[in-house]
Curated annotation (Swiss-Prot):
Keywords: Cytoplasm, Elongation factor, Protein biosynthesis. The gene is efp. Pathway: Protein biosynthesis; polypeptide chain elongation. One of its GO terms (molecular function) is translation elongation factor activity. GO terms for biological process: peptide biosynthetic process. GO terms for cellular component: cytoplasm. Involved in peptide bond synthesis. Stimulates efficient translation and peptide-bond synthesis on native or reconstituted 70S ribosomes in vitro. Probably functions indirectly by altering the affinity of the ribosome for aminoacyl-tRNA, thus increasing their reactivity as acceptors for peptidyl transferase. The keyword DNA repair does not apply. Its main location: cytoplasm. This is Elongation factor P. Belongs to the elongation factor P family. It is found in: Cytoplasm.
Length: 185
């Protein structure tokens, strides 16, 4: 159980038989009446977002989530299959469940898989990945590191803005949180 006073962004709770993650919270103490906590909750299974108010000190069950390191082994239709490297158990997630993170997911990559009981909820990618540039405009002699940027397509199909001196075939490091170029690899 967790008190509404302990809500923070990212805390997972159980409500109405499903797992919800706190996206935003605000502790409110009006001049008249009792304090309360206004929250914005995201359903981890469906992705829906709701606003809900809790009384200060109200307790709700905290979701018991398990984080396991798994390797992305292959794609079967719109299902992405992951395997636990210790127990060799397989778990699959649909492209909808993975969402926009799919653009950085490649076979053989190790990721954190979040489970609630036996149900797989979501995938956490590493904060940065190394990918090969498959398509970009050619660099021209005289392009410098401070001269600007151009779009590049990487091996997974994602588009990343890169410096002008980057050319096709180079391996670059990309931040998966904000799609930014971090450097050459």
């Amino acid at each position: 159980m967790i008190s509404s006073n302990d809500f923070r962004t990212g805390v997972s709770i159980e409500l109405d038989g499903s797992v919800w993650r706190v996206v935003e919270f605000l502790h409110v103490k009006p001049g008249k009446g009792s304090a309360f906590v206004r929250t914005k909750l995201k359903n981890v299974q469906s992705g829906s977002v709701v606003e809900r108010t809790f009384r200060a000190g109200e307790t709700v069950p905290q979701a018991n989530l398990e984080k396991r390191v798994m390797q992305h082994t292959y794609k079967d239709g719109d299902q992405f299959v992951f395997m636990d490297m210790e127990s060799y158990e397989e778990a699959s997630l649909s492209q909808e469940q993975i969402g926009t993170r799919v653009k950085y997911l490649k076979e053989g990559m190790e990721v954190n898989v979040i489970q609630w009981g036996e149900q797989v909820l979501e995938v956490e990618l590493p904060t940065s990945v190394v990918l090969e540039v498959t398509q970009t405009d050619p660099g021209v002699k005289g392009d410098t590191a401070t001269g600007g940027s151009k779009p590049a397509i990487v091996e997974t199909g994602a588009q990343v803005m890169v410096p002008l001196f980057i050319s096709e075939g180079e391996r670059i490091k990309v931040d998966t949180r904000n799609d930014s170029y971090l450097g050459r690899e």
